[in-house]
Amino acid sequence: GILSTIYIEVNKNVSQNKIKKVLASYYKNDIFIKILKNDTLISTNDVINTNKCHISVCKTKNKNKLIILSAIDNLIKGGSGQGIQNMNLKFGFPLKTGLI
């Protein structure tokens, strides 16, 4: 799997909860994306053999920096799963067909 660690710098008026809410709003209709509770440490074991992506927003010691963690199974969410998902889109099948 792939575990991404993304460091971001935020303005004083942008909180951890605000970032989480933006992500949750953006992905609210995506059945394969799960936004976890703040400061949840994630593992590729949580997404193995799935087309899912788990995302968590974590605090750091520095108040103007946050870490966004994401985990995917690069075989299912990667090449093979991407091919199936694209086929579903092209032919009008339900998005999760062959993936869940």
Language model feature labels by segment:
Residues 1-68:
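C-terminal substrate-binding/catalytic lobe of Rossmann-fold NAD(P)-dependent oxidoreductases
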Residues 54, 59-100:
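NAD(P)-dependent Rossmann-like dehydrogenase/reductase catalytic/cofactor-binding core
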